[in-house]
Amino acid sequence: MSTVGTGKLTRAQRRAAARKNKRNTRVVQPVIVEPIASGQGKAIKAWTGYSVSKWTASCAAAEAKVTSAITISLPNELSSERNKQLKVGRVLLWLGLLPSVSGTVKSCVTETQTTAAASFQVALAVADNSKDVVAAMYPEAFKGITLEQLTADLTIYLYSSAALTEGDVIVHLEVEHVRPTFDDSFTPVY
């Protein structure tokens, strides 16, 4: 016995029903990035309305057991006056080390200190290769400051237990900031 209205749905009706139910049939896989030290790393997405700018600073030659300071400079695309006023979110600092580097290498981002050796006492997070933590994440420390204040008031400090030659250590700085608005017209000077 058949009942009324149990006919087969057409393709258009099935698609309309699927749209109405909004069932997500896709399986979303997390993006796995190659870990910096050991274990599995997972990419952290930027907040909505934010983007992440990445730049590197090559370390100059450094003596053993001496803390050196590296100034933070903005990439060219963020150095306009309007982009310097963008608010900062989270900051990530990580170290790229050549295999020839031996001994402990530490790095941190803090407010500019009068003595470089005091920087690690006030740092909220330290990237340290001897502890397999070659990255330091600052989720709340610099939140709300502008990119201009980031470059003017903050400094990267690097300590090595062994002497370093130029290019042995590359410091990677990744800053999450409000997404910039780029100009879509030329300056009217003609």
From Swiss-Prot:
Looking at the keywords, is Acetylation present?
A: yes
GO terms of molecular function: RNA binding; structural molecule activity
Region of interest: Disordered? 1-24
**Basic residues bias (residue ranges):** 11-24
What GO cellular component entries does it have? ribonucleoprotein complex; T=3 icosahedral viral capsid; viral nucleocapsid
Q: Where in the cell is it found?
A: Virion
Q: What does the UniProt keyword field contain? A: Acetylation, Capsid protein, Ribonucleoprotein, RNA-binding, T=3 icosahedral capsid protein, Viral nucleoprotein, Virion
Modification N-acetylserine occurs at: 2
Looking up Pfam families in the UniProt record yields: Bromo_coat (PF01318)
Q: Which SUPFAM superfamilies match?
A: Positive stranded ssRNA viruses
Coarsely, its chief localization is virion
What functional role does this protein have?
Answer: Capsid protein. Probably binds RNA and plays a role in packaging.
The domain section of the record reads:
The N-terminal arginine-rich stretch does not seem to be the major RNA-binding region that allows formation of an infectious ribonucleoprotein complex.
* Family according to the record: Belongs to the bromovirus capsid protein family.
This protein is called: Capsid protein
Species for this entry: Cowpea chlorotic mottle virus (CCMV)
